[in-house]
Amino acid sequence: MKIRILTIGQKMPAWVLTGFEDYFKRIQPFVQTQVIELPMAKRGKNDSDADILKYCQIEGESILAALKPNEVLIALEVGGRELSTEKLADTMKSWMLEGHDIALAIGGPDGLSDQVRKAAAWHWSLSKLTMPHPMVRILLIEQLYRAMSINHNHPYHRA
């Protein structure tokens, strides 16, 4: 199994890079993980709903274009399915046994397009809270690492 994180936005603040890189390095011995940063559509100050929809569509097209044919697409969004860490570990174990490569899609500030939602095999919510997309990167990689540490009997997870 390989995991690719397809994420909108290329210029992250230093605190995001620091937090993300720590867990990104930790997860590599457990599962090959890659991050694909895709450009965020340029936004204006007084964008209409139609403009925002257009931005989401542009970003969605770049996510779908980056998707490999053998990957299972998982959309990260508020309305997705919530999982406990233990359930995530079980789910990841199933993916590994089935040989699935996974692509996790993180939208931009306005979320994911309808095209990405429809293409996704699964919809996952890290929380009912709305979060800035840079924060999602850190929470996602930490939860992936935590799940893999459970599956490998590593002492990181102590719940």
Swiss-Prot record:
<feature type="binding site">
    <location>
        <position position="76"/>
    </location>
    <ligand>
        <name>S-adenosyl-L-methionine</name>
    </ligand>
</feature>
<feature type="binding site">
    <location>
        <position position="107"/>
    </location>
    <ligand>
        <name>S-adenosyl-L-methionine</name>
    </ligand>
</feature>
<comment type="similarity">
    <text>Belongs to the RNA methyltransferase RlmH family.</text>
</comment>
<dbReference type="GO" id="GO:0070038">
    <property type="term" value="F:rRNA (pseudouridine-N3-)-methyltransferase activity"/>
</dbReference>
<dbReference type="GO" id="GO:0005737">
    <property type="term" value="C:cytoplasm"/>
</dbReference>
<keyword id="KW-0963">Cytoplasm</keyword>
<dbReference type="Pfam" id="PF02590">
    <property type="entry name" value="SPOUT_MTase"/>
</dbReference>
<dbReference type="InterPro" id="IPR003742">
    <property type="entry name" value="RlmH-like"/>
</dbReference>
<keyword id="KW-0808">Transferase</keyword>
<comment type="subunit">
    <text>Homodimer.</text>
</comment>
<keyword id="KW-0698">rRNA processing</keyword>
<comment type="function">
    <text>Specifically methylates the pseudouridine at position 1915 (m3Psi1915) in 23S rRNA.</text>
</comment>
<protein>
    <recommendedName>
        <fullName>Ribosomal RNA large subunit methyltransferase H</fullName>
        <ecNumber>2.1.1.177</ecNumber>
    </recommendedName>
</protein>
<dbReference type="InterPro" id="IPR029028">
    <property type="entry name" value="Alpha/beta_knot_MTases"/>
</dbReference>
<keyword id="KW-0489">Methyltransferase</keyword>
<dbReference type="InterPro" id="IPR029026">
    <property type="entry name" value="tRNA_m1G_MTases_N"/>
</dbReference>
<keyword id="KW-0949">S-adenosyl-L-methionine</keyword>
<feature type="binding site">
    <location>
        <begin position="126"/>
        <end position="131"/>
    </location>
    <ligand>
        <name>S-adenosyl-L-methionine</name>
    </ligand>
</feature>
